[in-house]
Amino acid sequence: VPNLQEVACVYGSKVGIAATKNNGKNWYYVGTANLPEPMQGQSTFWAPDVFKHKDTYYMIVTFIPGIHPFWGGDARLVFYKSKDLMNWDLVEEIEGTHGCIDASAFQMPDGTWKMWYKTPDSKTNTGVSKDLTTWKVTGKCEIDDVPHEGPIVFYWKNKYWNIIDECNLGYVGLHCYESDDATNWTYNSTILDKPGLRPDDFDQGRHCDVVVIGDRAFIFYFTHPGRTYKMDGMEVEENTWNYHRASIQIAELEYVDGKIVCDRDKYAKKVPSPIERKKK
């Protein structure tokens, strides 16, 4: 779409669906989820968190009415359920989440559910649900040491983990926190803060999700492969297609000497980065 102002290109988005037939080696585009919108008009969906409980799929997603040229809009978290991942029923707009985005939900040992999300002041707050029919925000902040977004919680290696994306235009990567109780978090490590070698993997890792399969954990993250950086690590900002373009990547997490590490180049074949291509 030509002549979009500032960040308007990231608004008006739907929830896209991709699928794989060979255990994640290759993916293909399926379409967009059929989500009843809480209000009429062209709106925006961001950061869906999808999980399954018994025979039903659930989704907590950021909903923003309208298209905006600058970061903003009346965001809130909305809760859906589905039997087939394509067609969804609206359960509720989660009360108390206006201005909040990027939810992640996980079931606790007592059977209740907990969610983590970004507040308007870029901290991680929480909410709870007893039976996935309604959510209640707690008002409790659990991570606030750096401004951040996109908290993702999972259980692996006998610990709870929360990976966040620091709100910074510099090259900072993703920060990992660990916890024994999914409430009190301690910084563990930073990953995906160095350029990778795979196609479109030259940028820092951004907003992620993690899938645990047995004893292995795989991180899905996105990059902006067309972006370049100054000597001080800050982005050279542009309002161009190449600057805004995003690519989804997958890598494996490893647990080494008590730390989460991620070698994004473990299976890579080197290709030239945007900077290397410009030098030719």
Residue ranges of predicted features:
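Carbohydrate-active catalytic/glycan-binding domains of CAZyme proteins
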Residues: 1-280
